[in-house]
């Protein structure tokens, strides 16, 4: 039996990044996610070196998030996806955590080594949070050095795989790596990383593939949030108010 899904990585809130371009786009993405079985959806706007989370941007994201939450048929929660950058090492990871959890989503840069990832993940961990490593299977670093996945797992940093890698959308290398990470137990959660209607926030297709390959019992924790405790913990009503920038 297919479980209700928890999707911990999406870009459904218009935030100035490469995700939803406006509220109508975000609503359409959320409605499709709900129809395909998602019960809880984390909106995780990008925090890039060239698109940081200023107080003003945080206010803008929060307003868009609250407006979107009113008009969507699923439970929408807020978090952020961090790209490693030195200034983040001076910030409190709590600001970026997936709402209601101690998890902070961090991506491995697609191109180049993963050096910055380790510094940021260690900073997150030292503050009492868990770094969740986003889509490592899509990165040049893991393709060049497959043992990187073992190093991350040995540190206790869970790996999040993209549905689109498992379905082959990102090419045979990403597909093969994603399946290997599931089969060796390093992949702890599958998420959509949905950006737009041509790359939607839905988990159902990947769930069918994974459950057919490893069985429903093994597949369920990858998709229902229980593997990271994302379903059990409820978010606080709202985050602390942002300051004007």
Stretches with model-predicted labels:
Residues 186-202:
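Short acidic/histidine-rich active-site segments
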Residues 6-8, 42-44, 77-81, 132-134, ...:
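Active-site neighborhood of phospho(di)ester-bond hydrolases with catalytic His/Asp-centered motifs
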Residues 204, 208-245:
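Mid-to-C-terminal alpha-helical segments outside catalytic/metal-binding sites
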Residues 1-73:
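An N-terminally biased module of ancient metal coordination in phosphate/nucleic-acid-related enzymes
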Residues 31-34, 125, 182-183:
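Non-catalytic positions within long, well-ordered alpha-helices that form the structural scaffold/packing
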Residues 48-51, 83-85, 138-142, 166-169, ...:
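Active-site environment of divalent metal-dependent phosphoester hydrolases
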Residues 23-30, 87-90, 115-118, 176-177:
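Short, acidic/polar
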């Amino acid at each position: 039996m297919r479980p209700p899904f928890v999707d911990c990585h999406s870009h459904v809130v218009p935030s100035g990044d490469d995700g939803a371009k406006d509220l109508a786009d975000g609503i359409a993405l959320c409605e499709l996610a709900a129809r395909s079985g998602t019960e809880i959806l984390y909106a995780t706007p990008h925090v890039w070196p060239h698109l940081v989370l200023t107080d003003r941007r945080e206010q803008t994201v929060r307003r868009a998030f609250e407006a979107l939450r009113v008009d969507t048929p699923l439970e929408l929660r807020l978090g952020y996806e961090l790209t490693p950058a030195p200034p983040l090492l001076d910030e409190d990871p709590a600001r970026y955590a997936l709402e209601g959890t101690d998890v902070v989503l961090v991506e491995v840069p697609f191109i180049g080594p993963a050096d910055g990832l380790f510094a940021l993940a260690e900073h997150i961990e030292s503050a009492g949070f868990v770094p969740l490593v986003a889509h490592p299977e899509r990165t040049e670093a893991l393709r060049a050095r497959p043992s990187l996945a073992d190093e991350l797992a040995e540190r206790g940093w869970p790996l999040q795989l993209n549905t689109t890698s498992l379905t082959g959308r990102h090419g045979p290398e990403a597909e093969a790596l994603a399946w290997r990470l599931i089969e060796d137990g390093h992949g702890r959660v599958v998420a959509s990383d949905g950006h737009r209607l041509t790359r939607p926030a839905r988990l159902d297709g990947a769930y069918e593939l994974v459950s057919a390959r490893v069985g429903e019992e093994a597949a369920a924790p990858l998709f229902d949030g229980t593997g990271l405790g994302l379903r059990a913990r409820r978010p606080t009503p709202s985050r602390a108010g942002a300051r004007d920038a």
